[in-house]
Every structure is written in structure tokens, then in C-alpha cells.
Amino acid sequence: MKNYYLVDEKRKTPVSTWEKISQALRRSVKLELFVGLFVMMRELLKRNNSATIKYPFEKVKLDNRYRAVHRLMRFIESENERCIGCGLCEKICISNCIRMETSLDENGRKKVGNYSINLGRCIYCGFCAEVCPELAIVHGIEYENAAEQRSYFGYKQDFLTPIDKLKNQVEFEGAGSLRKDANLWVKKTPNYYDVMQERVLENQNTKEQGENK
């Protein structure tokens, strides 16, 4: 028979019911509990210190790169559609929810006739916007798209920017497009430093030539 040794001989195992209740109270009710209650009551009684908003009367301002319902962009100058019908978004879609039908127009150029996205199946991963070479498809910030049916399709006319609202189209809005401060987040490469060094040398040579004159 094996010999068992108590790790903490000073700790007594409760036997009676009162000893068990007393041990449970000592372990559950401690000073940290009242500290947490004090912090909660302090934040609760503060005015204008709410961490939530009164939705739907108030809405959170989302970042431009938030991935919500898709948008198809136009060129502001010519008002033409940016989509060239390459089909990369349809091929890269991991949810298999994008369908595109293309044809050739009278000039022999590819034209997108039908474009649909199953919004109920889409997981809004953003791959379609990232792979688009023309920045034709981006993600907007319209997130209120609840529907009664699981299969909810959006079509080309639903995503494409109307011509009468083209002036309000923001170039850098939506995931897949470059941010306004994108240059600040680009990691400098050795080639960048070489170019900067060449510019410094050119400026020095220009100054020396000006002084010699």
C-alpha cells in the first residue's frame, strides 16, 4: 500500500456543514471583489462617460477600410465603369459567391453584362477588392443589410455608383483602395535610400556649381 503525504498539513479539511460553508465564503468573498464593485459604481455614476451609443439613433463612424457591402466604382472623368471583366474577383472568391457574365461590344472590347454577389454567402474577406487591378470593386460602409432570406443577392445596378451621385464618390473609400497616408506605412527599401543619396549628391553638386559661378 502506498504512503500518501499531505502537502499542507496546516490546512484542515472541512468535515461539518458549517465548516464547508465557512470555507466557501472565505474563498469567494475577498477584498478584490469590493474593489471591482467600487470601480464599476464609480464609472456608472459618472456623467457623459458612456462606452456605448444609443443605436439606431446614434451610429458609430466606421473606418474607410471597413469591409461591408461591396461597391462598383466609376471613373469620375469619363463616367465609365472601372470593371474590365477580367474575372479575377470571381476566381479568387473563397466563398464562391461572385458570378460574372461578359461579352464583346461592337468595338471588340469586353463588356460586363451581369454581375451578382450572394451577400448571404459572402464572408467579406476582402480578397476580391485586393486582387482587382483597376480598383473597380471595393467594400463600402453600409453594414445594415439584414434580410429575411438566407440567400440575398445583389446585382450590378445595386453596387454600381449612379452617375447622378458620381460627384460624391470618394476615391480612397473602401477596402481594397489605398489609404491617404499609405506612403507613411510603406517600409523603406535599400533602393529608396540609394535614390535619396543620389538626390543629396545632385543637390550638393548644384550648390557647388552655383558657388563657383
Swiss-Prot record:
It is an enzyme of class 7 (translocase). GO terms for cellular component: plasma membrane. It catalyses: a quinone + NADH + 5 H(+)(in) = a quinol + NAD(+) + 4 H(+)(out). NDH-1 is composed of 14 different subunits. Subunits NuoA, H, J, K, L, M, N constitute the membrane sector of the complex. NDH-1 shuttles electrons from NADH, via FMN and iron-sulfur (Fe-S) centers, to quinones in the respiratory chain. The immediate electron acceptor for the enzyme in this species is believed to be ubiquinone. Couples the redox reaction to proton translocation (for every two electrons transferred, four hydrogen ions are translocated across the cytoplasmic membrane), and thus conserves the redox energy in a proton gradient. It is found in: Cell inner membrane. Binds 2 [4Fe-4S] clusters per subunit. [4Fe-4S] cluster 1 binds at residues 83, 86, 89, 132. One of its GO terms (biological process) is aerobic respiration. Pfam families: Fer4_7. One of its GO terms (molecular function) is NADH:ubiquinone reductase (non-electrogenic) activity. The keyword Cell inner membrane applies. Its cofactor is [4Fe-4S] cluster. This is NADH-quinone oxidoreductase subunit I. Residues 74-103, 113-142 form the 4Fe-4S ferredoxin-type domain. Its EC number is 7.1.1.-.
